């Protein structure tokens, strides 16, 4: 069926080649990783520390946006390792090393890790702790003296300290300039590239000139938003001075990344044009990009002509209008607090997440899969396949599409890194290596390949798995490997986890990616409704600031999440993909366009002049009506019911009053969201399939 057809092998190969193209700062980052890995490996081998593969791999997950962030990001895994060892010793000593208690502790810890991965704003910490705990508690399943196991557990902390310290040292030696300046530069690079490309279309440049202008845009599209989001997190974590960054910086990064993507799609399909209207539309886009490059802002000068014709160009115009609809900075320095949200103001738990059924359901699924893998490999007396538990904890995601994406990438990385590179090195290279110099040379080459691949947008996770698999096969012990079984056993463990997770996540408790996108969009709309429901008294209360900070972080995170989930729809192999892809596009557009409504309202509530508007009955009434409509839209999206138009008109605000300008802007923002959602399918194939399956089960 056409709806279920997958991309061809040629298409996948083309995407992989695109993902490996050079992008800004990719080479420098890869070389720093190589240097840190080699330095850490030398220290571990010279000091004869038992753990080698895992601590060396952790260098890949260290933040590299600034030396301070590198130090902070190394303290977390090091601290988690200490906590994991402490909990391990408490469980073993407190229960006299009872095997049943050890097993139950694995189930409880993995459940907590899965639940906190959903409920926490610092999600990576929980799975990391779960993985480290399962690693050290499994040592007690072996017939080894207790003092040896305790020393081995402590060696894990020492090994992590050496390798992560090497990574921090390298980052401090090659420190870069301010993250704020680099973030501004990244915005300027993208705006400049977009202006150049669309200016070429506006003046009917030759095909060669257009292609030359298209290439930088295509490479920036391949880079995605991760680099800019990483720089944003540096500013947040270090509480740096925003230095005039625009309001709503995190959402603007997502909007700009989407603008680059749709512009690259247009440039790839149109390398020449003679249409006068298209040239005029491209000139309008180029002008807006130039204004954004100069000041991050552009007048709300919407395109005055029809957007009919080329759909790719229409998407560019829609995204650009969503950017220009964002609020502009004023001369007030108070706007700095609206640019970035310092990490100290981000709540640890997502509001309402602990009471959500989905949080505990996900924790149960992760716990069931990890515990079952743990039982199987110990019952079979086959500890070499312990990678099954690792796969569950690092690949367990909420949606079937995202999970399949990560599992497929993990399997591909294990085959390439563990079998081809790892097994190939053991067979062909290790017999001829007789010094640490030769080993470091081999590790450096493979590390560079893995680091370069890990910087990709679509397949970056494969690079991480290449490194993890290669290190696990070749650096399993302090001596040179002499057997071929480790590579085989790693794949067996991964295959076992794939089978169990496929059954649990895809067959028993499936959550489709489009369903999560609907839930995320509904959460965004309800957050905006909550903002519109704020009264003047509430806006002046002492607790208002903390409430708004949490809501602001939640909405921004959900909009970014929707864009990431949109890319995972491609991996929904088992369902009718085309309707889901269409619905995903609509949900993404609605989320991006809703950002301007949220941020304009947030600016209104942060200023005394704006709060004074909340005392006017006409404005309060319309805000309440729109808040109810946004709540109703959110409910319609969750239930997949048809979206109904608003059709509300007020009579309390005169046509020529300043308040009318605010209301017109508010109505316009809502109308854009509603217009997009009116095209959202009312019911997808996912629910039909589930309903049919439930009816068959009831009949049985």
Model-identified regions with their sequence ranges:
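Catalytic cores of nucleotide-enabled group-transfer and carboxylate-activating enzymes in metabolic
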Residues: 72-75, 324
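Juxtamembrane/interface segments at transmembrane-helix termini
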Residues: 122-125, 172-185, 460, 485, ...
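Long, hydrophobic alpha-helical segments that serve as membrane-spanning/inserting helices
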Residues: 1-34, 38, 46, 67, ...
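Pore- and pathway-forming membrane helices of multi-pass small-molecule/ion transporters and channels
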Residues: 7-15, 31-71, 78-86, 103-170, ...
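Hydrophobic alpha-helical transmembrane segments corresponding to the first two to three helices
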Residues: 406-410
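Membrane interface segments of multi-pass transport proteins and intramembrane proteases
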Residues: 90, 94-100, 104, 429-437
